[in-house]
Curated annotation (Swiss-Prot):
PROSITE patterns: ADH_ZINC. Belongs to the zinc-containing alcohol dehydrogenase family. The gene is ADH1. It catalyses: a primary alcohol + NAD(+) = an aldehyde + NADH + H(+); a secondary alcohol + NAD(+) = a ketone + NADH + H(+). Zn(2+) 2 binds at C99, C102, C105, C113. This is Alcohol dehydrogenase 1.
Length: 379
């Protein structure tokens, strides 16, 4: 493309301070260096992780910064050594990477790349420790290696999944983070047998995706557990068959679920990050074969306490990261699940706004309205 090797000036939504509305700025985006790609973002969406680090209540603030990590775009140019993707390829940026060289990437079991796994404290490129974004010569920090709230962004090639160009980017962009995380937690990690009973703790976007995964796997009962009963009706669209609101019961949730399921559920997936919900999700699975999967990220000081007999009685506890999907290897297959109509993505998308109104997406999330809001970069 004519812009290859040159600095590109474009619009980006910049966070200058914690919790303050993003402002539209003209930024300069440097060309990609070795093993990097520059991508024209067409659609992006807002994830809770963006909001968490934008609020910067529980971690070191890093501003000014360009947030965003759920997106779809087209490769504009590539740096030296890049062979996997070329200009014009349709891609999904991913907050965690796959270098394909480290022990994790070579393992059939792990997706936790040594080089490119998520690092929320790094605001620069891994290659040279510099930012590719600037305003008037002043660097602007990156976010989780993606920074998709910009018309153009630069990423390590290991954080870019090349997908079917026929796939609509305004739909499949949501597969680059939360939806795949929940889906994979069910189909790759919990692996519910056909006809089994699954409990999903937390019915936000990730929990609904976990329910969708359980539905795809053939679970016959999918029990949604949430303190917000308003979410229940919507969750039926994602396969939930019944619901438990802990506020409606005097017994512990794990006992309520055991009573409903003749001793415990076959699988549970915990998507809240609340350590008490994690304990409940583990203790509600059936002895002998029950498997609980933890997806939600707990508070840094949280402690998980349960009696060792719960393990000795043959309950299994697993953790997962990005649904155990390897980004470059597996995400193209998730997109194909959508293309084959095995996975419904449209029902996750409840709102859409032009890029100039990106702060509306933050307002919707703050109010708990909707599931995913698509941000259209072309307005």
């Amino acid at each position: 493309m004519a812009t290859a090797g040159k600095v590109i000036k474009c619009k980006a939504a910049v966070a200058w301070e914690a919790g303050k509305p993003l402002t539209m700025e003209e930024v300069e985006v440097a060309p990609p260096q070795a093993m990097e790609v520059r991508v024209k973002i067409l659609f992006t969406s807002l994830c809770h992780t963006d909001v968490y680090f934008w609020e910067a209540k529980g971690q070191i603030p890093m501003f000014p910064r360009i947030f965003g990590h759920e997106a779809g775009g087209i490769v504009e140019s590539v740096g030296e050594g890049v062979t996997d993707v070329a200009p014009g390829d349709h891609v999904l940026p991913v907050f965690t990477g796959e270098c394909k060289e480290c022990p994790h990437c070579k393992s059939a079991e792990s997706n936790m790349c040594d080089l490119l796994r998520i690092n929320t404290d790094r605001g620069v490129m891994i290659g040279d420790g510099k930012s590719r974004f600037s305003i008037g010569g002043k660097p602007i920090y990156h976010f989780v290696g993606t920074s998709t709230f910009s018309e153009y962004t630069v990423m390590h090639v290991g954080c870019v999944a090349k997908i079917n160009p026929e796939a609509p980017l305004d739909k499949v962009c949501v597969l680059s983070c939360g939806i795949s995380t929940g889906l994979g937690a069910s189909i790759n990690v919990a692996k519910p047998p056909k006809g089994s009973t699954v409990a999903i703790f937390g019915l936000g976007a990730v929990g609904l995706a976990a329910a969708e995964g359980a539905r795809i796997a053939g679970a016959s009962r999918i029990i949604g557990v949430d303190l917000n009963a308003v979410r229940f009706e919507e969750a039926r669209k994602f396969g939930c068959t019944e619901f438990v609101n802990p506020k409606d019961h005097t017994k512990p949730v794990q006992q309520v679920l055991a009573d409903m399921t003749n001793g415990g559920v076959d699988r549970s997936v915990e998507c809240t990050g609340n350590v008490n919900a994690m304990i409940q999700a583990f203790e509600c699975v059936h002895d002998g074969w029950g498997v609980a999967v933890l997806v939600g990220v707990p508070h840094k000081d949280a402690e998980f306490k349960t009696h060792p007999m719960n393990f000795l009685n043959e309950r299994t506890l697993k953790g997962t990261f990005f649904g155990n999907f390897k980004p470059r290897t597996d995400l193209p297959n998730v997109v194909e699940m959508y293309m084959k109509k095995e996975l419904e993505v449209e029902k996750f998308i409840t709102h859409s706004v032009p890029f100039s109104e990106i702060n509306t997406a933050f307002d919707l999330m703050a109010k708990g309205e909707g599931i995913r809001c698509i941000i259209r970069m072309d307005n």
